[in-house]
Amino acid sequence: MMNRWSALFKGDRVLWILIGLLMLSSLPLIYSSTGQLALRKYDGDTERSLLAHGFKLLLGGVIMLFAHRIPYLWLGRLSAWGVYIGCAILAVTLVYGQTINSASRSLVIPFTNISFQGSDPARFFLILWLARGLALLQKDERIRRFRDGWMHLLGGLMVTAVLIAPENLSTALMLLGVGIGMIWVAGARLVDLTKVVVGGLLVVFLLVTVAYLAGWPRARVWKNRMESYLSPTPGQEDFQVLQAKIAVSDGGLWGKGPGKSIQRNFLPHAYSDFIYAIVIEEYGIAGAAWVLLLYLGLFYRIRKIAMNARSPYGAYIASGMGMALMAQAVVNMLVSVSAMPVTGQTLPFISHGGSSILINALAMGVILSVSRDMTGEGDWSELDIEGESQTNKGGDAVPSKGEVSYA
């Protein structure tokens, strides 16, 4: 029986277990927190909300199984096309996207009722593209140089962020942070990175100020969220923040118990943006610590995979995907406990959602593919960064490092 499971779930088994625990932990939370959603979409049938969420988790699991069996080095040749596809999706979303909560973030697939956030696939494709570019720069020993080194990667990162920012500033800033983090991990000089970060912050501040003075609606939303965070008052703009604070303060050490949340009936988006507040209300500090430890464990395993990857490309993929997932989780938790302004970020594998679950599952599948190569369960040592056999090019195959233990 164990051999069957081992044959099905290859790579880092601890990573598989942690992802599974996050998914299982989400089920009672979604069932409890989707009352408002069920009233709007399912005539009050919360079981349908739970089944819909469970189906997305199951589909995410299938995607992980499929993705972790694909040699991650094959993704190198697809990454250039992928980043163009991601930017095209973002551009179409800006023009034809479905407006939700005063922001055009979702794109509806024609002839279906299925929608997805364009920033999710764009982020995935961009990280693959950055990882490939950084691996090639390291190979040519140009990662320490800016102008004839990683400047073009910064350009692609900025273009993607600019396309995301008008409707989702927090995601754009997080993506910029992940991209800069990947460049730093690859070995870029700290002085160059510091100049880029300082200059970027000044540009963002200038653009947001100009947008607000020009009367752009989204800029007003950003301003209102900052004001709500800095000086909350019992008004409509601060309703979410105040309700989340009540949920957190009522949780105590052990919480009210599963399904006994009161604030879920008043807190908008209790099943997505503020689900961590429901975790604290129902399961207390103990439940909040459990969820946090799962994410920390996930990040620790991904970090070990990145450090022991058998190619720079695999290391940068794992680093980028891991940073992106952890940043999303941390931001959601900080917002839920009123430690930062409202952003609209969901909690990976726990919040109710479609594209976020599926893209994060795909990202974890790719990381598991990297770990599968490390354990010797994927014999990809003869592939180069483009997924082509180096033996077929007339050279000797890359020597295998053997099985790597990272338990």
Language-model segments: what does each one mean?
Residues M1-L22, P28-E167, M333-P348, H352, ...:
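Membrane-helix boundary/helix-loop-helix interface segments in multi-pass membrane proteins
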Residues A91, I180-G181, M326, M364:
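Hydrophobic residues within the alpha-helical transmembrane core of Major Facilitator Superfamily
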Residues I100, S104-S106, V196-W290, R310-I317:
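Hydrophobic, glycine- and aromatic-enriched re-entrant/interface helices and adjoining loop segments
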Residues L173, V178-D192, I262-G287, G344-L358:
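Interfacial segments of multi-pass membrane proteins
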